[in-house]
Amino acid sequence: MINISEKAISARTATATGRIHLRRSTIQAIREKKVKKGDVLEVSRVVGTQHAKNTFLQIPYCHNIPIEGVDVDFNVGEDYVEVSCTLTTTYKTGIEMEAISCVSGALINIWDMVKYLEKDESGNYPETRIDGIHVVEKRKTPV
């Protein structure tokens, strides 16, 4: 792990985003809150937050940093759900890996909650895919 003891503390923010592509009927079930496992977006918000908080446990060279804020937002389109996670900290190292982890966790959870609606006759997922996970913005401000 990189030694950050000599680095200055800075206010840091990172935003990441990604999408899951789903059948239109699945999107309708999400909007109408008719998914068997519960409210997909609210559960995914919690899962994303948990993933952000546990990034250092999943990625061995990430530092355990003090997360001061997590905002998980959803944009539900006609055939996709876009997840956007913005995280903040005041620390010696960036928070972009936590933002990516937040997005990834939320997207994976969406898939888990709706997979029964997405499977075809053979049990596969021909229309379901997660893509576009990336850091949209990273800011660092001296304190």
UniProtKB/Swiss-Prot annotation:
Pathway, per UniProt?
Cofactor biosynthesis; molybdopterin biosynthesis
Q: What is its EC number?
A: 4.6.1.17
* Catalysed reactions, as listed in the record: (8S)-3',8-cyclo-7,8-dihydroguanosine 5'-triphosphate = cyclic pyranopterin phosphate + diphosphate
Q: Name one GO biological process term.
A: Mo-molybdopterin cofactor biosynthetic process
InterPro entries of this UniProt entry? Answer: Mo_CF_biosynth-C_arc, MoaC_sf, Mopterin_CF_biosynth-C_dom
* Coiled coil feature spans: none
Q: Name one GO molecular function term.
A: cyclic pyranopterin monophosphate synthase activity
Please name the Pfam families in this protein's record: MoaC
List UniProt keywords, sorted A-Z: Lyase, Molybdenum cofactor biosynthesis
SUPFAM superfamilies listed in its UniProt record: Molybdenum cofactor biosynthesis protein C, MoaC
Question: What broad class of enzyme is this?
Answer: lyase
Catalytic-site annotation from UniProt: 112
Binding-site residues for substrate, renumbered to this chain: 61-63, 97-98
Record family assignment: Belongs to the MoaC family.
Task: Tell me how this protein assembles.
Answer: Homohexamer; trimer of dimers.
For this protein, the record's HAMAP family field holds: MoaC_A
- Biological role stated in the UniProt entry: Catalyzes the conversion of (8S)-3',8-cyclo-7,8-dihydroguanosine 5'-triphosphate to cyclic pyranopterin monophosphate (cPMP).
Indicate what this protein is called per its UniProt record. Answer: Probable cyclic pyranopterin monophosphate synthase
The gene is moaC
